[in-house]
């Protein structure tokens, strides 16, 4: 499991421009991530997803996020997410640790 504090810094630097994590957070360019873990792709209420995201059909968890965050466009071809990905495994683990905590508390 990664480091939550390091993950928060990564989120602020690389994700917060397009995503929020708070329960009452608004959608931005990307969806609000509250309740992410255990939810299927393309299912955040009120966000307009591509058909690729809606039909991927996987459930978000540590393993699926770890793979997705390395190269989002390879994992879900046709996604609107224009982020290139995080290549360093430890950075992905830190970000996932932060997301797990921040999207459920």
Curated annotation (Swiss-Prot):
Task: Tell me which UniProt keywords the record has, alphabetically.
Answer: Acetylation, Electron transport, Heme, Iron, Metal-binding, Mitochondrion, Respiratory chain, Transport
**Residues modified as N-acetylglycine:** 2
Q: Name one GO molecular function term.
A: heme binding
Post-translational modification, as annotated: Binds 1 heme c group covalently per subunit.
Q: Which Pfam families match?
A: Cytochrom_C (PF00034)
The source's superkingdom equals: Eukaryota
Note the InterPro entries from the entry: Cyt_c-like_dom (IPR009056), Cyt_c-like_dom_sf (IPR036909), Cyt_c_1A/1B (IPR002327)
Task: List the subcellular locations.
Answer: Mitochondrion intermembrane space
The record's Gene Ontology cellular component field reads: mitochondrial intermembrane space
Per UniProt, heme c binds at 15, 18-19, 81
| Record-linked PANTHER family | CYTOCHROME C
Sum up the protein's function in the record's words. Answer: Electron carrier protein. The oxidized form of the cytochrome c heme group can accept an electron from the heme group of the cytochrome c1 subunit of cytochrome reductase. Cytochrome c then transfers this electron to the cytochrome oxidase complex, the final protein carrier in the mitochondrial electron-transport chain.
Stated family: Belongs to the cytochrome c family.
Q: What is this protein called?
A: Cytochrome c, somatic
**Natural source organism:** Xenopus tropicalis
Give the gene name. cycs
